[in-house]
Regions:
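Metal-dependent de-N-acetylase/amidase catalytic core
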Residues: 2-6, 80-238
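Active-site rim/loop-helix segments in enzyme catalytic domains that contact anionic ligands
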Residues: 1-95, 220, 232-235
Length: 238
């Protein structure tokens, strides 16, 4: 099965938080989408690996993805190794996605910026004919970096106003992370609990204001954008 869009992230729930609305929008547009979670988030404060896999499966259904896979790499121990690159490259060759979404290449969490480099290099080596890996050589056409976890101005933003509520439901499918039992609420971590709804809204509204819509998700690309019609370009200048 070939995919049009594959989102790669270090932990279950990262895709939902950074590009969930975009995944929903692309699936509704008829594109075949998928998610590759690199780890099970087993070193996190809340939940078990099995619980998070179950939550990821539920969230994936809400997002409408055709496939969701977990590589089971060690959480908090990601590195740009040949072994990990080959594991991701094998998935790239299997699904042949035209577009890949990666985390932004800078950030607070080592797994996030490591996943960005790891994903990029895996996409590259997947296209090397003589690389020691099963399958036919294939390299994605476009790589996007989700801007949500980084203090960076996005290259472009995707209007997710019509998909915001469904994205919200996908995020809240991670009950162990965002709606834990009271007995598990003693420890505080960076990901919000009571403040989650407000933070989700503020961030989506922030990107939305940039393009004149209610809610949006931001992305960064390293290449210059091409346009063939400067008269009908979107987003007002004033």
């Amino acid at each position: 099965m070939k995919l049009d869009l594959l989102a790669i992230a270090p932990h279950p729930d990262d895709v939902e938080l950074t590009s969930g609305g975009t995944m929903i929008k692309m699936a509704e547009a008829g594109y075949r989408t998928g998610i590759l979670d690199l780890t099970q988030g087993e070193t996190g404060t809340r939940g078990t690996p099995q619980t998070r896999l179950q939550e990821a499966a539920r969230a994936g259904k809400i997002l409408g993805v055709a496939v969701r896979r977990n590589l089971g790499l060690p959480d908090a121990h990601l590195s740009v190794s040949d072994e990990y690159k080959a594991a991701i490259a094998a998935v790239i060759r299997e699904f042949e996605p035209r577009t890949v979404i990666l985390p932004y290449w800078e950030g607070r969490h080592p797994d996030h910026y490591t996943a960005a480099r790891l994903g990029y290099e895996a996409c590259f080596v997947a296209g090397l004919k003589n690389y020691a890996l099963a399958g036919i050589a294939y390299r994605p056409f476009k790589i996007l970096y989700a801007a949500a976890y980084a203090d960076v101005r996005p290259t472009f933003a995707v209007d997710i106003t019509k998909h915001y509520e469904r994205r919200r439901r996908a995020i809240l499918a991670y009950t162990s992370q965002f709606r834990p039992p009271k007995r598990d609420r003693k420890s505080k971590v960076e990901l919000p609990l009571d403040e989650l709804e407000e933070r989700m809204s503020l961030q989506a509204r922030h990107y939305g204001r940039m393009i004149g819509v209610k809610f949006a998700e931001g992305f960064v690309v390293k290449e210059v954008f091409q346009t063939d019609d400067i008269v009908k370009m979107p987003v007002r200048s004033m």
